[in-house]
C-alpha cells in the first residue's frame, strides 16, 4: 500500500535492544557551550537545590523554547533518552532504530517553580494521546515521555496524568499514552545531549518552524 499525500504510517512499536543501532562510546557533544538564552551550563555542574526532569513532547526544538521561557527554569538542553543506542546522532534517532525519544532536560529551582507546574505545562503543550507521533511528526522518537528523578515525582506525574485524562476524555480525546517512569529505569539511564546545532535551536534560528501541538484542554 502506498503512502498518501506524502504521509507515512505511524509505527506500532519501539525497536528492541537486539535490533538497535550500536552507537558509540564518545559523546556527540563533549564540550557543550553555555545556554544561548539563559547563559547557564547545559550539562552541569548544577547548583545545590536545583532539580531536573526529562520530558519528550514531540519535536524538541519547540519544546525546549517552551520551558526556557518559564520563570524558575535555570537551564534546558535537548537530547535523546529512553532507548538503547549510546551517544546516538540525530540522523540515527530519526531512523527509529535507537529506541530514543527526542527530549528536553529541564533544570529548575523548586523554590520558584514546582515539579507539578512543569508537568501541567508539559501536558497542556502537546497531545499526549497520539502515541508515536505529534501532529505531522511521525515516529517513535516523537512519543510523549516524562523521565523523573524520584519515585515521588513519578507518582505525582501519574496523578496529574490521571486527572488530565478525564478532561481530555470530556473533550473527545483518547487515552493518554505518555510513558512516565524514572530516568534511572530507562535502558541507558541517562539523556544523551544532541548536537550543538539543535541546542536552543529556535534562539539560533528565530524563523525556524517547530510548533507545539496543544489540545487546548487545561491541565489543572
Curated annotation (Swiss-Prot):
Q: Does the keyword Oxidoreductase apply?
A: yes
What is one Gene Ontology biological process annotated in the Swiss-Prot or TrEMBL record? protein modification process
| InterPro entries xrefs | Met_Sox_Rdtase_MsrA_dom, Met_Sox_Rdtase_MsrA_sf, MsrA_MetSO_reductase
Q: Which GO terms describe its cellular component?
A: cytoplasm
Which of UniProt's keywords are assigned here?
Oxidoreductase
User: Which domain of life does the UniProt lineage start with?
Assistant: Bacteria
The broad enzyme category this protein falls into is oxidoreductase
Instruction: Tell me the organism.
Output: Corynebacterium kroppenstedtii (strain DSM 44385 / JCM 11950 / CIP 105744 / CCUG 35717)
- Positions in coiled-coil regions: none
- In short, the EC number is 1.8.4.11
Tell me which residues this entry annotates as catalytic. Answer: 59
One Pfam family for this entry, by name?
Answer: PMSR
GO terms assigned for molecular function: L-methionine-(S)-S-oxide reductase activity; peptide-methionine (S)-S-oxide reductase activity
Q: What is this protein called?
A: Peptide methionine sulfoxide reductase MsrA
Give the protein's function: Has an important function as a repair enzyme for proteins that have been inactivated by oxidation. Catalyzes the reversible oxidation-reduction of methionine sulfoxide in proteins to methionine.
Reaction(s) catalyzed by this protein?
Answer: L-methionyl-[protein] + [thioredoxin]-disulfide + H2O = L-methionyl-(S)-S-oxide-[protein] + [thioredoxin]-dithiol; [thioredoxin]-disulfide + L-methionine + H2O = L-methionine (S)-S-oxide + [thioredoxin]-dithiol
Query: Which gene is transcribed and translated to give this protein?
Result: msrA
Q: Which family does it belong to?
A: Belongs to the MsrA Met sulfoxide reductase family.
Amino acid at each position: 500500500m502506498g503512502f498518501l499525500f506524502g504521509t507515512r504510517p505511524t509505527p506500532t512499536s519501539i525497536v528492541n535492544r537486539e535490533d538497535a543501532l550500536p552507537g558509540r562510546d564518545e559523546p556527540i557533544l563533549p564540550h557543550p557551550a553555555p545556554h544561548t538564552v539563559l547563559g547557564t551550563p547545559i550539562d552541569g555542574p548544577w547548583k545545590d537545590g536545583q532539580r531536573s526532569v526529562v520530558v519528550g513532547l514531540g519535536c524538541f526544538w519547540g519544546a525546549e523554547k517552551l520551558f526556557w521561557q518559564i520563570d524558575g527554569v535555570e537551564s534546558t538542553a535537548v537530547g535523546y533518552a529512553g532507548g538503547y543506542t549510546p551517544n546516538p546522532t540525530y540522523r540515527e534517532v530519526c531512523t527509529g532504530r535507537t529506541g530514543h525519544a527526542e527530549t528536553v532536560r529541564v533544570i529548575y529551582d523548586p523554590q520558584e517553580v514546582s515539579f507539578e507546574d512543569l508537568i501541567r505545562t508539559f501536558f497542556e503543550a502537546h497531545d499526549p494521546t497520539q502515541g508515536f507521533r505529534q501532529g505531522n511528526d511521525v515516529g517513535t522518537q516523537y512519543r510523549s515521555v516524562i523521565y523523573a528523578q524520584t519515585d515521588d515525582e513519578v507518582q505525582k506525574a501519574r496523578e496529574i496524568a490521571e486527572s488530565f485524562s478525564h478532561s481530555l476524555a470530556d473533550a473527545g480525546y483518547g487515552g493518554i499514552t505518555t510513558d512516565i517512569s524514572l530516568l534511572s529505569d530507562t535502558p541507558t539511564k541517562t539523556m544523551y545531549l544532541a548536537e550543538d546545532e539543535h541546542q536552543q535551536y529556535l534562539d539560533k534560528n528565530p524563523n525556524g518552524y517547530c510548533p507545539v501541538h496543544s489540545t487546548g484542554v487545561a491541565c489543572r
